[in-house]
Amino acid sequence: NEKVTVVGPKKSQANVSILGPFRSKSQVELSATDARSLGLNAPVRLSGDLAGSAPCKLVGPAGEVELAEGVIVAKRHLHISAAEAEKANVANGEVIMVKITSADRSLIFDDVEVRIGEGCDATMHVDTDESNAAGCTSATVGELIKK
């Protein structure tokens, strides 16, 4: 349960969790709101696509490091197993839509990229801005819509 502080040109954000998996380059995923509040112009990208992304400083208990690039707003995506993908008739890298029905804030997310991998149930990854916009909870279920 390690935490760091992300430092941008305008301010800092403390207690940011470090998550796996380990990657060859350091990566920071922020919501668009958090990136803007730090003064960072973070592009919307899939994990690992860091070329030309925003810089920042990371400060932790063992010291600090300047990242020349590595800050992104994570592109919304759907993790799904090969069996579930076959049943839903979607392919890895395909862009779909997902309809979220909630009490007060139902909406359709467009530009959701499918990421097929074993060992995962269908799980959509959105940031806190997107989750709040749709009124999502941990029990929210979405409907996959092909484009």
Question: Where are each of the predicted segments found?
Answer:
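Short, charged beta-turn/beta-strand-edge "cap" motif at the junction between a beta-strand
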Residues: E64, S102-S106, K147
